[in-house]
């Protein structure tokens, strides 16, 4: 490894055992992230005999697999490296389930709304980044995203707390009485991205509906600093807020608002984007990203150790979509990427990544979440150097169906009977649960 001066190390380069990263040198970034991506894929077991395509080794749950494939999509796009594209394609298609809505039978009794959502976010990402389309006889990326959105929207529960999604789909699962932010924030987030991709106003209406409910029950603050909290219980009519703050929840609301501003040009969504960005400062110390709720006391569980990955991804997309956020976000991403690179100096391979990026070396922590977080923060330093998310009017070529996911299904709260010709975008779902169909009928079918 070459020696570097203190000044250059502070600005753009870090050199450590096993991993060298120079943010001013794209080849250096490609080489460094290739090592991190390889370490991430070390946890993938779907190619092994008797294992399930798309799944990672224990103890990593199904939802985190969806998050990991989203991470690998970012790696492909920003690093222009298609090494793992066949695995990404196979995983995203294998886990769709019989109804192509990411409720596969092997997960259907334990799956929560948030679990399903992270696969929906991954396929939305595939559509927006123009990842190679599936074969013609397979569901397309936009279709799969719409199916996830529609099945989640059907579970909107107006009978308790005036609305909102429950955490769990089935009554027998722990957490059924909890309406958590990640489920509702993900519904908002997916609606916002579908709105921008399709131009369909009914998705905007849905995003506004979810946002207003979350604000009404105080899951999100209203002001110039909009902090995002964990959830509420229906047992006290959603009056007591669990005030844990997680990076991925903040990111869902931040980037969802950015998508809506980019689509609508609305001052309201511009203001909200900046308010969520202001509140995001709680997750940085000297511009280095950390999971504030658990990292200090060293109590982060397996899931929580991956949250920074999604937040870094959502920061990158926000910077792409809202120019005024770029200076702050890129300062955070660049500083955090260099810090993360220092942590990727552990293990027998010399480039296993850790959890704590404040150190100048590996902290002894390792796992899928650590690799994901380091990879996402590194590749998103390039967020402004590639084309922003595509949509149906600027080069996006994924096809869908506004009625996707509305086939009668045991996970839906009520069976639906919709003919094949009923394809008026997301307005179908809006109409089913009481929103006007008049405006929705004017939109194109995707």
Curated annotation (Swiss-Prot):
Residue positions the entry lists as glycosylated: 31, 81, 106, 200, 222, 237, 262, 278, 285, 334, 391, 397
Subcellular location: Secreted, Cell wall; Cell membrane
Single Gene Ontology BP annotation: cell wall organization
MF annotations from Gene Ontology: mannan endo-1,6-alpha-mannosidase activity
Topology in the lipid bilayer: Lipid-anchor; GPI-anchor
Keyword Cytoplasm: no
Gene Ontology cellular component terms for the protein in this record: extracellular region; plasma membrane; side of membrane
Propeptide: 423-446
Region of interest called Disordered, as start-end residue ranges on this chain: 389-408
Record keyword Glycoprotein present: yes
EC number: 3.2.1.101
Signal sequence interval, chain numbering: 1-18
Lipidation (GPI-anchor amidated serine): 422
Record key words, sorted: Cell membrane, Cell wall, Cell wall biogenesis/degradation, Glycoprotein, Glycosidase, GPI-anchor, Hydrolase, Lipoprotein, Membrane, Secreted, Signal
Source taxon at top rank: Eukaryota
Chief location bin: secreted
Primary enzyme class: hydrolase
Reactions that this protein is recorded to catalyse: Random hydrolysis of (1->6)-alpha-D-mannosidic linkages in unbranched (1->6)-mannans
Similarity comment text for this entry: Belongs to the glycosyl hydrolase 76 family.
Function of the molecule: Required for normal synthesis of the cell wall.
Name of the protein in its database record: Mannan endo-1,6-alpha-mannosidase DCW1
